Swiss-Prot record:
Residues 339-381 are annotated as: Disordered. GO terms for biological process: protein catabolic process; proteolysis. GO terms for cellular component: plasma membrane. Its cofactor is Zn(2+). It comes from the Bacteria. Pfam families: AAA, AAA_lid_3, Peptidase_M41. One of its GO terms (molecular function) is ATP hydrolysis activity. Binds 1 zinc ion per subunit. In the N-terminal section; belongs to the AAA ATPase family. In the C-terminal section; belongs to the peptidase M41 family. It comes from Haemophilus influenzae (strain ATCC 51907 / DSM 11121 / KW20 / Rd). This is ATP-dependent zinc metalloprotease FtsH homolog. The keyword Hydrolase applies. Keywords: Hydrolase, Metal-binding, Metalloprotease, Protease, Zinc. PANTHER family: ATP-DEPENDENT ZINC METALLOPROTEASE YME1L1, METALLOPROTEASE M41 FTSH.
Amino acid sequence: MGRQRGAGLGGGHDEREQTLNQMLVEMDGFSGNDGVIVIAATNRPDVLDPALTRPGRFDRQVVVGLPDVKGREQILKVHMRKVSVAQDVDAMTLARGTPGYSGADLANLVNEAALFAARVNKRTVTMLEFEKAKDKINMGPERRTMIMTDKQKESTAYHEAGHAIVGYLVPEHDPVHKVTIIPRGRALGVTFFLPEGDQISISQKQLESKLSTLYAGRLAEDLIYGEENISTGASNDIKVATNIARNMVTQWGFSEKLGPILYTEDEGEVFLGRSMAKAKHMSDETAHSIDEEVRAIVNRNYARAREILIDNMDILHAMKDALVKYETIEEEQIKQLMNREPVTPPSGWGEPKTQQAAYANSTTNDTKPESAVENTDDFNV
């Protein structure tokens, strides 16, 4: 209703614009002593008509951002009242492990955990179910029905191991939380990094570390199988890395050659009331320089990731073996591999699902009840 009035294209917006005009007139018509307060909400303030936010109309704006760790804890406690949770479930622990979650995401987390518990006839929801629910939300649902050959599993394991090793060793990178070669969503495998806290901003060093990590999966395939046998699994990694590198140059001022200047501007769609004309903000020479700077950033981080993997080929092979054997490894196994120590099985590995359910029931019944870098294959999308 409050969308910005357009440039007259489409022909189907006349009634909507007349409604907006009438609302603006009515809001102007309120006298000062009527005591009428008009409240509205939107998750797209960028498309609002400027007339709506002028003084005398919606002139007070309250931004409701994502909850911090304390807010997430309180939200989780509210939703956890609706399910029977075990005593080992700690809302603060879950809150620390869910940075960037919205209130709806947290509600979904509790619901998914309850569903996992119900599928194995458990009376209470334990931390195991919450971890499974978190993995499903963060990395997508498991596709156990997808059959992968031994060669595909090995290739995916090397790819994900490359991400994990470089992400573990580059400076100021988010810690590696979990690596899996079980197909999830549209990905053949996932390496999930979990931030240690809420991130407000990110430094150039962190961005470059992320670039090295994104290219590490492709590089691992290159080092093991040769350049001619690299798969299409790194397509999404390349897309994300290229966007980061270009934004570093054109928006965030991380290029010494071009300086802290904005070289791109999102003018928006004409159907949202933006101008039909497309302005050119740079010369052809500047555009060429931007491309050169983007390539330079990518090349130096590509080279760094390659050097790290060459220096740690023994860890790459060992992590591949662990992934092929266990399919999913967690922080403890990753730390053991990086320290070149023997690998212990991950939690819950080696027990049939029925035994796991029976064991969980026997433990929870004794207590009183009281909360990615992906390897994608374009041909499977």
